[in-house]
């Protein structure tokens, strides 16, 4: 008789656990509703903002700035005063 009593209390717990697992299955449908509003909001802001600022700004500043300063500067200032100073000494 003692062995039968031990088996009885072991069977009801599993049934209770199964019912608890079925309950959380109903609320999940509400979760998929949240990611739907966040998805269309993120891609709409960074897409038109990134390509419009760095594209026309980077190629227009470094191109005309680099060749205009280093070219005429070292060819007229460094060679002239450097030779005169060495001859005087």
Swiss-Prot record:
The keyword Nucleotidyltransferase does not apply. One of its GO terms (biological process) is keratinization. Its main location: cytoplasm. Residues 75-89 have a biased composition (Polar residues). The modification N-acetylserine is found at residue 2. It holds the Pfam family Cornifin. Keywords: Acetylation, Cytoplasm, Keratinization, Repeat. This is Cornifin. It is found in: Cytoplasm. Residues 1-29, 68-89 are annotated as: Disordered. Residues 31-78 are annotated as: 6 X 8 AA approximate tandem repeats. Belongs to the cornifin (SPRR) family. It comes from the Eukaryota. Residues 3-29 are annotated as: 2 X 12 AA approximate repeats. Cross-linked envelope protein of keratinocytes. It is a keratinocyte protein that first appears in the cell cytosol, but ultimately becomes cross-linked to membrane proteins by transglutaminase. All that results in the formation of an insoluble envelope beneath the plasma membrane. Sequence repeats lie at residues 3-14, 18-29, 31-38, 39-46, 47-54, 55-62, 63-70, 71-78. It comes from Macaca mulatta. One of its GO terms (cellular component) is cytoplasm. Induction: During squamous differentiation of epidermal keratinocytes.
């Amino acid at each position: 008789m003692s062995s039968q009593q031990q088996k009885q209390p072991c069977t009801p717990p599993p049934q209770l656990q199964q019912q608890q697992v079925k309950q959380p299955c109903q609320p999940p449908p509400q979760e998929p509703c949240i990611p739907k509003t966040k998805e269309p909001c993120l891609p709409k802001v960074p897409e038109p903002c990134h390509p419009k600022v760095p594209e026309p700004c980077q190629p227009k500043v470094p191109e005309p700035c680099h060749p205009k300063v280093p070219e005429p500067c070292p060819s007229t200032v460094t060679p002239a005063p450097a030779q005169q100073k060495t001859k005087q000494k």
